């Protein structure tokens, strides 16, 4: 984007590390009609400070279709919400929610690390960010959108699996 004027493009995809989209938006004169799709977590939580729509079609289909700015949901958040949103829509979430989910190595993010290499993951399953994963706030936000009375805990334990792609949640 440093070499191409922003008013010369139709859609801008941010496939950047968390925090970089927000920095870019604050430091550049972004045309009002430029469509933006952000894959980071910068704009997933609704706020009066931005006009990004949470882009989970199963939740916000109409708004996503007409939005200028779309915040792409997180991987675990998408998987978990696809199972829980029908319950929230029917007001069936009446207590704490417990989720165990395992992700393949492609869900490890953009920075390579010891735990993202196949030689380490092979025949291993490991827990990370138990009860403190960054996707929990966006899951809670979506559940409250459909079931305003939902105010329970989401006890989420994410695991790294020894397979390359996909997520399994229960």
Task: Map each language-model feature to its residues.
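N-terminal Rossmann-like NAD(P) cofactor-binding subdomain of oxidoreductases
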Residues: 1-123, 128-130
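Charged docking surfaces used in two-component/phosphorelay signaling
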Residues: 107-170
């Amino acid at each position: 984007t440093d070499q191409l004027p922003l008013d010369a493009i139709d859609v801008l995809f941010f496939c950047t590390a968390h925090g970089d989209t927000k920095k870019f938006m604050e430091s550049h004169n972004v045309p009002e009609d430029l469509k933006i799709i952000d894959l980071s977590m910068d704009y997933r939580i609704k706020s009066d400070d931005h006009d990004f729509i949470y882009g989970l079609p199963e939740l916000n289909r109409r708004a996503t279709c007409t939005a200028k700015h779309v915040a792409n949901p997180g991987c675990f958040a998408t998987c978990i919400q696809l199972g829980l949103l029908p319950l929230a829509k029917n007001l069936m979430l009446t207590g704490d929610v417990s989720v165990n989910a395992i992700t393949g190595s492609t869900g490890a993010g953009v920075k390579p690390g010891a735990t993202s290499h196949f030689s380490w993951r092979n025949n291993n399953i490991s827990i990370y960010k138990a009860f403190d994963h960054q996707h929990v706030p966006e899951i809670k936000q979506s559940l409250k959108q459909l079931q305003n009375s939902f105010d329970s805990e989401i006890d989420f334990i994410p695991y790294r699996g020894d397979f390359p792609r996909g997520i399994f949640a229960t």
